[in-house]
């Protein structure tokens, strides 16, 4: 018996003991300390558009983008640009524009001809950037015919002529674009054609020559969605997402990228990259959760400008999973110096169309390094990019992708959300708190929720982010329009006004501003004020919980008395309010005090208890299974040792006893096909009046052709043909119990025992005794021919063709079957006395040596009588009829004896036939290929 069950509990115990040391790599979503909405907010906090604008009343504002200049908030929308004085808004006048410009499309008719809807044929202001300190550049879609204008920042009056907006502004308002002025030139990234098939990074409107990216080259840009552009050092950086080229085998997988170009790039030579960028490089932004299997947030949604983080300039970005993946969002920060260092990495290439992208070895990279700015660093010897060698220009055109990806700060996301709506926008205040050293993130989602998050290592110094507040900022009554509910609730813009202590939230149909904190809700309860952990709130001894703005809150306490926070109800000397529904701290989530926490069961102890209980149960289960298996094994051994029939007499064995029989009946005269007897039958007695079915010509080992075997030897004994290896090992003292016949095999049929048969029968225990009885002397019957002489019966006939490798008989070629039947009615004749059975029951070697296992659950065979199939039953009470009982030895108890009425055959025995010229022989060991 295998002893595996004894080791299973030990293995399970070791596995369970290792579980407490395993930690989940994926961070959990933080729970909000406070959930609020905008109920009770003043209507002046909302802006939907001009009151006399019928289109705005129907469609809403159709917000496009924010721009803050000198305490002035500019809002680009459909057909308008609104200007809000933040100083006046701070004084409480509400969100009312002090001036605005109107710029309507003059090409509505052509837009309709192009197959566009009326709602799309407006002028959506997609570009709004400062040209200089006095001038503003604005570009609109102009009914799918983009144009640009310049306006005065203070007056919002047009200055100069209109300019073409192609490659500066998209044709469709749903297409992405970014733009920025750097050293007097406009750097823009958008789609340059009506079908949005030509994505371009373009420079224009400056003293330097216009340049663009390679056209229709997927290695440079492949269906990009531009998010942000900024100037840093000698380069201009573009942040976008695009369909990956290095993982194209995975399908349309989007990756987040950052690309850069040199501000002093003058283009290539006439031989390579003429009027194209010679410094365009890009690499991947890696925002992922580390682990054995890295989980990526690949889709860049929004990005901030440079923010101070730990004394270094960093960019905060919102990333999401793929559109067909599990919804999830993450916030990752990247240091600008790490991004610059990433552009010094190795180049990547694809050797073959189906091959993987691999780094290029350094010995294949030309000098100076491709992508370097001419006149700086390694390319300082070249005054202009037009003077660069051709091999450098050719290399940079074919290898714009770099490796590896830029890692995030702390090499993991600052925040992950998997059970909430997807994040869409981000705004960061890196100078929060009384000492301007706390970083607070404001995140917008696609369900209209604003999340206020304290970054890890903030005020509490913990490693996990703290979700301070969750605000539902959407109002269907003020922001709904013809847009769908999902599109209308999506936050598409966030603008932070730290001086005014406000956050502007933009939806498609409206904009609203929120205060950065609402400390007054905590009232005079010190515990509630400090438990909120809001860096914009602090406890003042005389004024209670107040707002902290900049460095003016140095006299405000944000730590408080820890003892007063841990014990007792929320009481204050000024109000005397207590904890409860009326307390301002009621509903604020906070940590349990240590006294309550100590009453809980430690997690290691709980896990150890569970592991011990499971191990004990596994041990008991293994012991029970082992005992059951041993008991079953002993019972099986007893069954094998029980004396009795080695196996019951099968149909094949009985058929082999009667090799001869009458000829098959002639075909019917009416031409009908002879019915094929059933191949399978049952041992159950048939109902009354129903003729017994016939069995098909059962295949026998003699009728199965035997494959030729190497190293054949002649059979030494003609009786060895049908004996197996077991018969050969028992020596000559064993009697042959099998009979090989070259003729067709008989068919047998089982019938129920006849009623009224007397007890005159011969009990047969083994097939050897049955053959001994059949071959013994038999009284002659009336009218029967005398038996053939013994000498004629003992001589072996000529070898049958079937035994010498000839074709096996088919079912329709079989001889007429002999049926073992019972006498239908009448009285049974007297049978001679049963011969004494003194020898032990030998094993039966019938059927080519194949032994069937004896089963104690097998039903006993029915009474069998041998009757010709073609004529009436031979059963009668006259002489020559004998009853045979297939009995069991004395050691096999508990079952009734079985009777078989068998008529002794009048045919001669057919011993195995082996021709002298036959090339077939029994293989070594007496095995047969049946």
UniProtKB/Swiss-Prot annotation:
Residues 554-593, 654-674, 716-761, 775-882, 908-930 are annotated as: Disordered. Keywords: Cell membrane, Developmental protein, Differentiation, Disulfide bond, Glycoprotein, Membrane, Neurogenesis, Signal, Transmembrane, Transmembrane helix. Shows growth cone collapsing activity on dorsal root ganglion (DRG) neurons in vitro. May be a stop signal for the DRG neurons in their target areas, and possibly also for other neurons. May also be involved in the maintenance and remodeling of neuronal connections. Disulfide bonds join 111-121, 139-148, 262-373, 287-332, 479-510, 519-537, 525-570, 529-545. It is found in: Cell membrane. Pfam families: Sema (PF01403). Residues 25-604 are extracellular. Residues 1-24 form the signal peptide. GO terms for molecular function: chemorepellent activity; semaphorin receptor binding. It comes from Homo sapiens. Residues 626-930 are cytoplasmic. Belongs to the semaphorin family. This is Semaphorin-6C. GO terms for cellular component: cell surface; cytoplasm; plasma membrane. It is a single-pass type I membrane protein. The lineage of its organism: Eukaryota, Metazoa, Chordata, Craniata, Vertebrata. The chain crosses the membrane at residues 605-625. Residues 829-844 have a biased composition (Low complexity).
